[in-house]
UniProtKB/Swiss-Prot annotation:
Its EC number is 6.5.1.2. GO terms for cellular component: cytosol. InterPro entries: BRCT_dom, BRCT_dom_sf, DisA/LigA_HHH, DNA_ligase, DNA_ligase_AS, DNA_ligase_CS, DNAligase_adenylation, DNAligase_N. It comes from Thermotoga petrophila (strain ATCC BAA-488 / DSM 13995 / JCM 10881 / RKU-1). It catalyses: NAD(+) + (deoxyribonucleotide)n-3'-hydroxyl + 5'-phospho-(deoxyribonucleotide)m = (deoxyribonucleotide)n+m + AMP + beta-nicotinamide D-nucleotide. The active site is at K120 (n6-amp-lysine intermediate). GO terms for biological process: DNA repair; DNA replication. It comes from the Bacteria. Keywords: DNA damage, DNA repair, DNA replication, Ligase, Magnesium, Manganese, Metal-binding, NAD, Zinc. This is DNA ligase. The gene is ligA.
Amino acid sequence: MSERKIPKEVIEEVERLREEIEYHNYRYYVLNDPVITDEEYDKLMRRLIELERMYPELVTPDSPTQRVGGKVLEGFKTVKHSVPMLSLDNTYNEEEILEFDRRVKKTLQEAEVEYVAELKIDGVSIALRYENGKFVLGATRGDGIEGEDVSENVKTVRSIPLRLRKPVTVEVRGEIYMPVDEFKRLNDEREEEGLPPFANPRNAAAGTLRQLNTALVAARRLDSFIYYVVHPENYGLKTQWEALQFLKELGFKVNPHSKLCKNIQEVIDYWREWEERKKELDYWVDGVVVKVNRFDFQRILGETSKAPRWAIAFKFPAEQARTRVLDVTIQVGRTGVLTPVAELEPVQLAGTIVKRASLHNFEYIREKDIRIGDYVFVEKAGGIIPQIVKSIPELRTGSEKEIKPPDKCPVCGGKVGKLDPEEVALRCLNPHCPAKLKRALRTLVSREALDIEGLGEKLIDRLVDAGLVKDIADIFYLTPFDLAQLGPGIGQRTIAKILQEIEEAKKRPLHKLITGLGIPMVGQKTAKILAEHFKSLEAIADASYETLKDIPGIGPEIAKSIVEYFRNPKTREIIEKLKKAGVKLEERVMKLDILKGLTFAVTGTLKNFTREEIVEFFEKLGAKVVNSVSRNTDYLIVGENPGSKYEKAKMLKVKTMSEEEFLEFVRKRAELKGYNFDEIMRSWKEWS
């Protein structure tokens, strides 16, 4: 049987879709400057998936569809590095960095030496190889000589291109890391599932990269920064600074905070600045990497068997403090997981007073040998979450008490145990435990979800304790009489305000409700994807695993979690109660024609919108958004610190307006078409 002939137009469309999707991946994940909406991106991806299903012989390793994961690997092959991946020597003080500078200048016989200062990302070192611009290998550092081939997992990292912007054969190196928000989300999820949390973002990134299930890797949203070109002389590069610009041109994500320093004092100033500012970042850094800028100087300086002599890691001080464990309390999570929490003698740590630290689970307590009364070292995992890293047995007096697992739930007195023998966490097994319900209600009424400000933590506790709320849907059935029963402090005005907020919450956008349901692995971004795709909660509840897993941004692991959540009869009962209470279960489509027929571009930073939000706002009002200014552009919106688009707009005589002028322009156009501008902005804020 002869091979079937694939129509030429299909081959051309597949190639065009791949190029277009990779371009939009680059805009979104590398430049953080998207030019299309999520809905438009999903449409492109769905079309490519459809064509590759029809013509599987067209699937290639560098297709964007290969990023979503789904393979289960048997193991990782060992690969030899083309050039050893050396580690760095460390220094922790300014005197040692000055000594490093003196050694460098003495060897080179130079009065001053230029350095490149780069933030030291707390992640996993990675080597990436490309042939004719196509990704062929991703390998971990390993022992520096050999590493593991983790190519399939690397493909799931959206900021790492599968095709370069130039068809070069090159090997580069960098860091794969886990953003702080993702680290926190993952650890919260692991604790809810009874799994041990990761100690820090580096461990989380390393553990994720070594997963055999690529779908799980894709679900964890790793990111990257690339900073090194192997054999830079092959590309005419003479300095590290030139190499960073070259990496940007190829389409890699390069850390925007790297700095070219004229001398070592500028390096020290840079280190001091980022030691103060590091908490502004959405990734964890533990110091500054200092590199001699010129490659000819690097070759003269050479390296030892372990580390280069032309670079050093200038580490930030460890954020650790010593304190004492006064007591241990136990929290009950939304899924019943019992989390022991150490009550500490207050101690100053990384700019805040720390009084409590999670002990994660009783296995963690046993391994660390932590007791009530112990002196312990506390640090902030990933710079955010206080945790005990070790006890100090040498300081024990004999009065310390062992911390024993409870034999019943501290809240309801119900039976405790494990759902699975592999679990490390204990759970309350009582399905009616009020602590579970309280946590679920806090998620539902939070600002990110239905935003019912009047239902604070204390009031939720009182409602559950009084038996007035038995599941999350019950808050929509509360009456003035119910609230009045809660006793003093709840007056008529407060009751009216709470009921008004609950009534308004019924009209919130669908993605806010989905966020509030607390579906495992479904955060705000995934909730928006689901709402835009299905348009109703009932459609999501009825969706099959096969349908869900193929939606861009969902994937197999999240799909499995969604299906399991809606398979529960109690969930179906809650949806029915929400519907009867008048809670909006459909997505309100905000699509107006106020700016129909107009083309806009944006430059600079806006006050009221992120770049992604302004693109969505234009789309919702019927406008077309472009990334570059041309004679076909009607208006350029100019924010703070505008770029080259502003000069081009002036040259082409394209009309420009400030953000304030733009909003006034929308107001006038809305009124002309019979729309209420304030209502539009209110609806937009609710939706976004």
